């Protein structure tokens, strides 16, 4: 294992590779973190594996040994634990840099229970304070999180559509999108889908 101190790694902009769909990823990050089989994905793409976290039940003994040898830091998690491997990876990153910006790849698709656990990461009270710093990305979707209260969303030129999913039964307002939602026309849905950006203007929710 090419071990270094976790404090020596630049955690400012981190990519986390989970063990799901491998169809999409980017490399414009300061460091790469593998979660279980996602660690092998990083090595196969010839990227530097800063941190490998997991119980590694989805890899062979030989693959686990390779991950341990190549990772700068290796964390073997117990199979029985309160937090998922992905949650443990995120908590490690935010422990080292509370301002880190994290993009997660390979978190969608596959087992529905795993995917839903990933989508609702900020429901973990230990991760909730960092929700604005977490994004989940695949080739078609970008999931970001907003805390309760007033928030601004900056449009991205590579996405045309957006949707909103309030976690609680709150009265959501949407200002600046094609289909606005205000007190005057409010109706409750669990998912407000198929909205659109307008001229890359800020959206207020």
Please give the residue ranges for each predicted region.
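Histidine-anchored nucleotide/phosphate-binding helix
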Residues: 37-44, 89-90, 118-124
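Short phosphate-binding loop-to-helix
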Residues: 74-97
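Conserved small/polar residues in nucleotide/adenosyl-binding loops
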Residues: 203-205
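A conserved acidic, glycine/proline-rich C-terminal tail/linker
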Residues: 173-200
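N-terminal beta-strand-loop-alpha-helix module at the start
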Residues: 1-66
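Beta-strand/loop-alpha-helix module characteristic of Rossmann-like adenine-cofactor folds
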Residues: 143-182
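Anionic-ligand-binding alpha/beta catalytic cores of soluble enzymes and soluble regulatory domains
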Residues: 103-148
């Amino acid at each position: 294992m090419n071990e270094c101190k976790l404090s020596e790694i630049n955690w400012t902009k981190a990519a986390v590779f989970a063990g799901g769909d491998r169809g999409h990823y980017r490399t414009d990050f300061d460091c790469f973190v593998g979660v279980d089989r996602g660690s092998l994905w990083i090595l196969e793409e010839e990227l530097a594996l800063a941190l490998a976290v997991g119980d590694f039940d989805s890899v062979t003994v030989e693959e686990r040994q390779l991950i341990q040898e190549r990772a700068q830091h290796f964390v073997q998690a117990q199979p029985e634990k309160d937090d998922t491997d992905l949650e443990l990876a995120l908590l490690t990153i935010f422990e080292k840099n509370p301002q880190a910006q994290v993009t997660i790849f390979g978190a969608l698709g596959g087992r529905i229970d795993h995917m839903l656990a990933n989508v609702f990461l900020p429901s973990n009270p230990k991760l909730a304070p960092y929700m604005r710093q977490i994004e989940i990305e695949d080739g078609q979707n970008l999931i970001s999180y907003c805390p309760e209260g007033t928030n601004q969303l900056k449009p991205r030129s590579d996405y045309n559509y957006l949707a909103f999913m309030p976690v609680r039964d709150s009265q959501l307002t949407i200002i600046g999108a094609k289909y606005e939602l205000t007190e005057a026309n409010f109706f409750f849905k669990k998912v407000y889908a198929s909205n659109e950006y307008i001229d890359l203007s800020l959206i207020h929710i």
